[in-house]
Design a protein with these regions (language model features):
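Nucleic-acid endonuclease domains
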Residues: 1-42, 49-135
Length: 135
């Protein structure tokens, strides 16, 4: 279990990542609070996952919407954000990435090398060639 301080830090890093992504895209973040999957993190429908360790994976959980793109954002110690890549939720849910390191909740840990280039994500959430995710 996380301490209240670690929880606060994780929440702040998440907000920094969401705002960094939105600034990079030139869009607005969602300002909805406690919607838990009902509303995407950003106006273009993306879910933002933040890391502070450059070697960490993008994590997708079983209750995450499968049709949304998930973007991995690295937040450094100066609150500078780097967009690392993205993947659709349903693409992330592969057995080879399923792990349960804490013994509480299995999740998919997608390696950075398996993410799509960030430049291929358009403002409306479509892949650059115009296709939509397959379900």
């Amino acid at each position: 279990d996380r301490s209240w301080f670690q929880h606060l830090k994780d929440e702040l890093v998440g907000v920094i990542a969401e705002n960094g992504y939105c600034k990079w895209k030139g869009i607005y973040p969602s300002r909805d609070v406690d919607t838990f999957h009902g509303v995407a993190d950003t106006a273009d429908g993306a879910e933002i996952r933040s890391i502070t360790n450059a070697n960490n994976c993008l994590i997708v959980r079983s209750d995450d919407p499968k049709e949304r793109p998930y973007v991995l954002v690295l937040v450094d110690s100066n609150a500078i954000c780097k967009m690392l890549g993205w993947i659709y939720g349903h693409e992330a849910m592969q057995d080879k990435w399923l792990r349960d390191p804490g013994g509480k909740r299995a999740s998919w840990f997608v390696p950075q090398k398996s993410l799509r280039p960030i430049e291929s994500l358009q403002a409306d959430g479509r892949v650059a060639n115009g296709t939509h995710p397959q379900h």
